[in-house]
């Protein structure tokens, strides 16, 4: 009887050990402790630090508005001194273009809280048409290239005045239809023509992913802005600069009005 009992005990122990081994073999392998490589942000996307003031995952909204001038303003004209067959006799002064209801054209609006990394993939065009820079104010992202065209077929001279970017002064004769320059740092840059002294324009190099230039009715619009609280800045070559706080809510339109008076 004792031998029989010993044999049964041995069989029982072997069965238990076999069951334990089977369970160990079916367990999932342990996860590696090595870190997962980070995914690089898409070119031109706002940086992580730039999004600190927004609410990721909470949606986007829109910012619209107008820039208005309060006060009286006389419409100015600029006489043309040469090449009148192309330039004409005179033109309206573009440095302060105001509509009948005070609408301010060519004001630059941007969200200053948000930044994006430079991207050399962006290109913009600044043309010279009837001895005017078109557009009068051009906004580009940091790292962009500007193609300066000469649609007039006469001699022009493109002369920039800047502090952070390399200034250039290049003749553009009628056969040179295009020249290109890259702007690597955020800055407001004045553009002049030494041949035609009345020609003036601006290149605004912005590191914000959200900017606009007001149209003739003084309006601007920014779409797909992440939810959050921001500082909205407006700049105008004659009226100056001011800021205003805004809050963007998911699926909503935030309307903002900027009012200027003539600086004393």
Report each predicted region and the residues it spans:
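Sec-dependent bacterial lipoprotein signal peptides
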Residues: 1-19
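Extracytoplasmic copper-binding redox domains, predominantly the cupredoxin/blue-copper superfamily
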Residues: 21-264
